[in-house]
């Protein structure tokens, strides 16, 4: 990629979609990159951060904007590359994304002012509803999201070195915390991997490595649509 790569995802044909610089790229099986989206004419992308597919091939992309500039937004890229400004909020550095297990909400990490997770209803026609607060995470910089098969939401935090689990009944609980910052070291995105989706992995920006966590949980399967 031409610049630092933020988040990435894969479609059902094996193409990769990655956020780099001010664009979203599509990468084929030979490693050839093409520009998939630069935003819209009126709203060009500034700092696309993380992409996630819905089941129909719509690609939601958080554009974090500038750190502390409160100019973030969320784009939706339709199959083929046509791009819409899907939501102009949250503005305070929208970061990691995930689709709810039933496909009815887009969950969004908001890293700043104040750090939290929100969700935005996905209306039947695909437009954005009114955003809702899910949970606040004081004194942190949340970054990544993932659901497990039981509907629990996992939230990785760049600061401090922690992963939290949230559900409506038990609230927010700490799953992993590394006060030394050695095994985790500024975790960013997280994902459930493996044949049974029972390996939780985090990418760690602080020491440029990947950490595996044995947490006795399996991930909810992601969407891998065929995108023409």
Describe these PLM feature segments.
Residues 1-22, 41-59, 66, 71, ...:
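Beta-rich, blade/repeat-based domains predominating
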Residues 179-180, 194-196, 204-209, 215-219:
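A short, acidic, flexible beta-alpha connecting loop/helix-capping segment that sits on the rim
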């Amino acid at each position: 990629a031409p610049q630092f790569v933020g988040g990435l995802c894969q479609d059902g044909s094996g193409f990769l979609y990655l956020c780099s610089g001010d664009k979203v790229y599509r990468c084929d099986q030979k490693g050839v990159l093409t520009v998939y989206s630069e935003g819209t004419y009126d709203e060009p992308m500034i700092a696309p951060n993380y992409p996630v597919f819905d089941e129909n091939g719509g690609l939601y992309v958080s554009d974090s904007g500038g750190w502390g500039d409160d100019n973030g937004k969320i784009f939706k890229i339709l199959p083929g590359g046509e791009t819409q400004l899907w939501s102009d909020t949250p503005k305070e550095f929208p970061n990691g994304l995930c689709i709810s297990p039933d496909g009815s909400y887009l969950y969004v990490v908001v890293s700043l002012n104040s750090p939290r997770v929100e969700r935005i209803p996905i209306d039947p026609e695909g437009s954005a509803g009114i955003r809702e607060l899910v949970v606040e995470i004081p004194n942190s910089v949340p970054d990544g999201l993932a659901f497990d098969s039981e509907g629990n939401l996992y939230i990785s935090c760049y600061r401090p070195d922690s992963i939290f689990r949230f559900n409506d009944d038990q609230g927010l609980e700490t799953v992993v915390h590394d006060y030394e910052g050695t095994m985790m070291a500024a975790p960013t995105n997280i994902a459930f991997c493996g044949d049974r989706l029972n390996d939780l992995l985090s990418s760690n920006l602080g020491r440029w490595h990947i950490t595996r966590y044995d947490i006795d949980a399996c991930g909810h399967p992601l969407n891998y649509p065929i995108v023409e």
